[in-house]
Amino acid sequence: MIEYIQTYMVADEYRGQFELSFGPGGAWSRLFARSPGFYGATLLRNADEPRRYVVIEVWEDRTQRKAALAASQREYDDFLPSLERWIESRQELGTFTRLAEAGVRPQRKPRRR
């Protein structure tokens, strides 16, 4: 499994549109929704700089991501002009392999006697 990570700096006036497009059921996820190997995308907004976002796509492997991009090229090309208008900068952080995942168990409430 791989995670493809990008950061975006979005103009204030387009933050809502960006969030809708990259959020659940948005244009970005719809590009890949039926693609083999696509597990989903996560949209994060920086708590200190609300114009800065991180998008994390989760895929089975690089080959399936590349194939999905090729298969969705027309839709991507249609989406690109809007994206370019909304963003001030974009940086690809890269493709990462998940090595480990840690979680915190929920605390149990003390039982009443």
Question: What is the predicted role of each segment?
Answer:
Residues 2, 39-52, 77-113:
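Glycine-rich beta-strand-turn "strand-cap" elements at beta-sheet edges
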Residues 2-9, 54:
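Active-site-flanking beta-strand signature of metal-NTP-handling nucleotidyl enzymes
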Residues 8-11, 15-16:
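N-terminal presequence-like segments and adjacent domain-start helices
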Residues 13, 48-50, 63:
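Short alpha-helical
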